[in-house]
Amino acid sequence: MKSSNKLMALGIVFSIAVLIVIGTIVYSIINDKKDKGNEMFAYSTQQSLGKDDAPVKVVEFGDFKCPACRTWDVTVLPRLKEEYIDKGKVQLYFINFPFIGKDSDLGAAAGEAIYKQDQDSFWIFYDEIYQSQKKDTEEWITEELLLNIVKEKLPKIDVEQFKKDLHSKEIKEKVRKDSDRAQKLKVQGAPSVYVNGNLANPDFDSLKKAIDKELKK
């Protein structure tokens, strides 16, 4: 009887030890993914939508002048938000890739200046500037347009602070770092979308397949 109790106790200890080892391995894998993501995309410095502990990180490289990015915002993002982001499965990050025209940089700077004050306001701006989009051959992103968006749609943003930040060295440096990151990753166009560090086709069906694959790991 005593021998049986000892064997049972040893079995329990062994089971606990195995669980600890498995837990350590899983924790290590998750942290490795986070470290890889932080190295590639600098998650902590980027605009994000969704829970920080979401298991899948989706990164969009975009240009507010890009017609395909506007289409992505209108057709793909709402479904991504409904099926994954709002359920805590995906956290979305936006990284500037201003490549179409001179005013692409101004749009990127505006987004960063708004994000500096309030992250939720950035995502309102994200939708509003895409709704204001004109032909990509026109320089339609102007300070007048940006100020109108801030004044009319973003009550949490201090307008005077926004004006100061828009052309500040700090904001220009942030946009430059985003551009450098895109260059290092050899981003070819926008929107370019990554799922847990892997480049994916930006259409919803392809993203769903890539996300579901990551969720099963």
From Swiss-Prot:
Disulfide bond entries: 66-69
Q: Which UniProt keywords apply?
A: Disulfide bond, Oxidoreductase, Redox-active center, Signal
Query: Where is the signal peptide, in residue numbers?
Result: 1-28
By its UniProt entry, which Pfam families does this protein fall under?
A: Thioredoxin_4
Q: Name one GO molecular function term.
A: oxidoreductase activity
The cross-references to InterPro entries, in alphabetical order and at most eight, read: Thioredoxin-like_fold, Thioredoxin-like_sf
Q: Could you name the domain of life of the organism this protein comes from?
A: Bacteria
Indicate whether Signal appears among the record's keywords. Answer: yes
Keyword Oxidoreductase on entry:
yes
Give the matching SUPFAM superfamilies. Answer: Thioredoxin-like
Q: Which family does it belong to?
A: Belongs to the thioredoxin family. DsbA subfamily.
Which PANTHER family does the record cross-reference, listed alphabetically?
DISULFIDE BOND FORMATION PROTEIN D, GLUTATHIONE S-TRANSFERASE KAPPA
Protein name per Swiss-Prot or TrEMBL: Probable disulfide bond formation protein D
